[in-house]
Amino acid sequence: MRRRPAWLGVPGKDADGAVLLTGPEAGELLKAAVEHAGGGLVDWHLDHVDANPGQSTTATYQARVQWPAGERQELFGMSARASGPAVTDSRADIYVDGSREVAVWRYPDDPDLPGLSRAAYPEQMAAIISDLNLVGARVSAQQINLHMIGYRPRRRAVLCVEVNNRRFYVKVLREGI
C-alpha cells in the first residue's frame, strides 16, 4: 500500500485546506512544486492567508529558490477548496492524491488574475502604455519603473507604474468584475 504524503492531510479532515496551507506540511508541497518547475527550495515562510472557513483557503509563501540560473526570491500561492478545484484552478498546477487537490502557482501567474502576468513585467507594461498612447510616445521597458503596491491572491493586485515623469496605478481584477 502506498503511503499518503503528509501534505494531503487526513482524509475527511481539513476540507478547506487551512491546516495544510498554514502548517509545516505546506513546505513539502512547496518543495514538490519548486522541483517540478526545475528549481530547488532553499527556504520558505508563510506570507499571507485568505481563509473562508469550511470552504477554501489561499496562502502565499515567500521562498528562496535555487534555479539553474541562480538563486532568487519568489512568491508562490496555493489554494485548497472543500468543493474541489474551481474552473480557474486549471491555470495553475494541481497536486492531487485521493480527495485532496491543491492549486499551486508562482507569482505573477495567479489563476484568477490572468492579466497580472501581463501587468507585472516592464516589457509587457511598456507595450500597454504605448498601445494606449498614455504618455504621447512609445516607451521601452527600460523607461518603466514598476512595483507592486498590494496583492490579494486570487482577488486583485495594484501596481504603480512610473514612466516619463508620470505615475499610473494599475488595478488587476478577476475576469468578469
Where are the language model's segments positioned?
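Phosphate/pyrophosphate-binding loops and the adjoining catalytic core of nucleotide-dependent enzymes
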Residues: 1-177
